């Protein structure tokens, strides 16, 4: 149990640091580094924990991770009065299937067509799952998040 909690802590810390580093490269506002890191950490933590479910696949884990990070994105965008694109762009970084894309191209170049096709289809499924998770949460009405955070909306001019 202690080993699992230690792994969870390390996963959270590394995903937070990686997302903050990507926020720096992405030129996110300095005041938004910590919320950006929290969105990436939320998405990766849910992804990692979902993989422990019986029968869970990386596609399902990516979908649940995308749901979690987009929920965090919507909450932070209302609470911090900042566009959600700042948080979702940085927060998606840990979930992007970069290794899958790399291995798809590697197998293609090496002439391993069966492995290329299998890895390419899996990578495409993960990418679609992430996109669906983001779209589902972004389709929720904004008033829901304004009420959740306790604000009625942007200030009127």
Language model segments and positions:
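Hydrophobic alpha-helical membrane segments
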Residues: 91-103
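The feature identifies polytopic integral membrane transport proteins across all domains of life
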Residues: 83-93
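Alpha-helical transmembrane segments and their membrane-interface boundaries
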Residues: 1-75, 82-84, 106-157
